[in-house]
Amino acid sequence: SHIPHRPQGAHPEVYVEYEIGMGENDSVTREDALKKLNSQIMAGEGPDLMILDGMPVDSYMEKGVLLDLAAHLDGLSGEQELFPNLVDAFRRDGKIFMIPCEFQLPVVQGEEKYISQIDGLSGIAEAVEALRADNPGADLLDICSELGIMRTLTAVCAPSWKNEDGSIHSETISEFLENAKRVYDAQMDTLAESEIESYRQRNEEWRSYYNFTWEESPYFTNGLDEIGYIAGEKKLDFGTVGYAYGYAFATSLERRDDLAGSRTDFLNGQGGKVFIAETLAGISASSPYAEKALELLDVLIGKESVVGEFSVNKAGFEESLMPDPEVYESDDVPYSSISSSNGDGMVVEVDIYWMNEEQKERLRGWIASADKAYVSDSVLEDAVYEKGAAYILGEQSLEDAVSEIEKKMAIYMAE
């Protein structure tokens, strides 16, 4: 990982010990790793700086485990300045307990006449229903399961599933499931059995290699499938852009004659414009080395930080929009090319052009409008998926599904 090396280089006088709760090949479960960490934190023996992705951050904030970073972050200026709206998305009662080092944006790719309908979650359902009306029998999304549909829509919806105090907002979960069912029903209506079987096989192949299915993998929701979209394997492509080359790839499709009328747009879901927060850093409130930990944090969110996705640091982000001068000639000369073939022998070739100033401005506008952070909450999401699947498949009423989600979360919160 790049995380420990950069602080060590910036502060050679400080010894940075880097501890991983769960290695790729060890047998430690997520629950066991969290229990061990929680015990250390409560005893005041935990790490000074923590990467909090996938951890029970609501509980940590409630228990006063994390240091308030607001004064420190608000004091950053010049090349240290962060995107203010992304910082504000983490402010609670004036306090900030964690900050993402990097982020992605949720996007949708498709024909203008359909994606122009998408303004919020019901707009997504309307667009897919309109596509089905115009394309009977076609595979609209290349997603053939209720879990796949729910996972695809989660990032732009989940931030509205909880109230400020961490309690469940049942109405928005109900609205989510209702519209996820509309999307699922429209996608599956008239779809060939061969498409459904092919999707099932892909999931099983992933399970045999990785112990999780394709739709359970991080790659399922990350990035875009431009090749699949060009090849006609789907009519709408939901995904993310999280780095400059990925955005250049997405915008290059707008230049193709065979995709006239197609574009990529920022995706709105439930309540607000969402950005996907990643590599969430927080500092232990009981750390005896809080000052050093803040210096280490400054490196992680600094201009020079080697993050894989868009940096929350404004200067670092702007630098990432600059193409490699050894490769770049002009906006109108391909920056690179990709050729891909599928199992049917169909070859797709794509010229990728570096983004022009207008396209960069569009991206900056998307970022400036983002006001809600998506931070994964696997316990809540798994509850929604499990009970929501029964509703989407017609095995349970919407009211019963939401009621069971509430019960499951109440038990978890009480533990």
Model-derived features: where do they sit?
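C-terminal capping/gating helix-and-loop segments adjacent to ligand/active sites or protein-protein/ligand interfaces
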Residues: 275, 335-413
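Periplasmic-binding protein-like
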Residues: 133-136, 298-334
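Short, solvent-exposed loop/beta-turn-alpha elements that line the ligand-binding surface or hinge
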Residues: 71-81, 158-178, 182-183, 265-271, ...
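Short, polar/charged alpha-helical segment
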Residues: 2-15, 384
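Extracytoplasmic/periplasmic substrate-binding proteins
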Residues: 183-291, 295
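Hinge/lid segment of periplasmic solute-binding proteins
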Residues: 54-107, 258-267
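Extracytoplasmic "Venus flytrap"/periplasmic binding protein-like
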Residues: 19-82, 228-236
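Helix-loop-helix "hinge/cap" segment bordering the ligand-binding cleft or interdomain interface
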Residues: 91-203, 285-291
